[in-house]
């Protein structure tokens, strides 16, 4: 699924993605395919990811920069 980074809290290692389906997905740094890219993610940046559901709601998996 395509999405846009809506918030990144790099010092805490997570952020949020607004999916093309209108839902907001939690993104942990471990979900970014190339972990070193996490530090370079910026709000408004377009990404591709797999949507999933975790214990606390929607989660982004396999996040990659498009």
Give the residues covered by each predicted segment.
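Residue-level signature of catalytic and energy-coupling elements of molecular machines
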Residues: 3, 44, 60
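A short macromolecule-binding patch
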Residues: 23-31
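Structural detector for short beta-strands of small beta-barrel domains
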Residues: 1-11
């Amino acid at each position: 699924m395509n999405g846009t980074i809506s918030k990144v809290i790099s010092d805490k290692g997570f952020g949020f993605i607004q999916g093309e389906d209108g839902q907001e997905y939690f993104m942990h740094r471990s979900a970014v395919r190339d972990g070193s890219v996490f530090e370079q993610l910026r709000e408004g940046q377009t990404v591709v990811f797999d949507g999933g559901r975790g214990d606390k709601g929607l989660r982004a998996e396999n996040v990659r920069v498009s």
